[in-house]
Structures are given as C-alpha cells and as structure tokens.
Amino acid sequence: ISLGLVGSEMCIRDRDLEGTEYSIIDKKIPFYQLAIHGYVNYTGEALNLTQNTQNELLNSAEYGAGLAFTFMKESAFELQNTLYTEYFGADYSAWHDEMLEIYTRYNEELGHTFNQKMVGHEYVTSELTCTIYEDGTKVYVNYSYDELQADDGTVVPARDYVVVR
C-alpha cells in the first residue's frame, strides 16, 4: 500500500484481522497493521454478524482496528426465507444495549491510539499478546480461558483485553 495515496479520512472496512490459518505458521505477526496504523482507519468484520463476537473484539483490540456493526431497523425474522440470512444478527433492537456497552468501553480505553503509529507487537505467551503504540500505551489481549499475567505484572482477565497507559 502506498501511504502517499491514502487520505486520513479513508476507512478500510471488513478487514480480515486473523489472516492465514496455515498449520505451518506458528504465530501471526500484524505486518499490515504495523505499516498502516495511524495513517488509515480500518475495521474487522461487523461484530454482530461474525461467527464469534468475542474473538473479533479481541482481534480488533490486538490489531488496533476500529469496531464495526451492521444494523437494520426491521426484525431479523423479516429475513427468513430470503437470500440475506447472513444479516440475521443485524436486528438493531436486539443488539442496542450490548453494542453501546462494547463500543463505549472500547472507545474510552483505546480511542487515543487510533491516530498513533503501532510500534511493536509481541507474544507474551502463546495466548497473551501485547501491542505497543508510539506514546507507550500497551494493549494486552488474552485469548485464554484463564486469567494471565504479563511480565510487568499486568493481570489480564480471561478472554479480555487491558490497556496500560
């Protein structure tokens, strides 16, 4: 990607945050995100339409992605017997409260990193990652079903993220 051609108002939506799942790859390294973070806004899949909302949220926190949701006004039952069943989770009234809770926390804790360069990414353990931003902010993401502790003493609850400023 040529950053000279990218405007700051550009947003890349529905980015595959997980990348390849080849069995010969031990760890995923976010080369793409390291290169563009702070220059271009990007999101993963819409949280309410993905097969695993929690994984997509954790991937977004690890890779510095914004959050995306796709909603419709009508009930999801309107989609039965149509070709649009992939939007079955787009019922706004069903997601409103959870969406506000997820978005508010994410924006309050990570909003200050959106225009910063991502300067580092490391695996603390096989299930605990740390993404580092130019102001020194660290974002720990725990994919484990157990609470984990980072080398600096930061405790990260199971299947959650912690931002250290």
Predicted feature residues:
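Active-site-proximal substrate-binding groove within the catalytic cores of carbohydrate-active enzymes
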Residues: 2, 6-9, 13-165
